[in-house]
Amino acid sequence: ETESSLGEAISEVYQAGISPFWWKITALDTEKEWQTMTATLDKYDPDVGVIILGKNAPIEQFKTWFSVARSTPHTCGFAIGRSIFWEAWEQFAEGKINKPEVSEMIAERYQQVIDIWHNI
């Protein structure tokens, strides 16, 4: 369902005469989903880039997602916000951690994601 609806949506955008420089796509779970999406992008714009969105998922999930996503020539990076900052923000808002701790926690989580990206 996801792969066909995503592919259809991408096709409709191109058929409407819109050619994005980047696509921001929620992380897909399987290689088959990425292959379908890649085939659609190749059909319309083989040079377009894809940025992966993180769905507020646990950081541990990114290793699997990045591994599959990086098998396509379109994947250029990630835009993962809540997975990096949300837990720290909640703890700060509840008074469990202070400003320096929130910054440290966010920096550590961001570094984890960068390390996963570079070590795939």
Where are these regions (language model features)?
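Catalytic beta/alpha-barrel core
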Residues: 2-3, 9-33, 54
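Generic structural signal for short, solvent-exposed loop/turn connectors between secondary structure elements
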Residues: 1-3, 119-120
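Catalytic-face loop-and-helix region of soluble metabolic enzyme cores
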Residues: 26-120
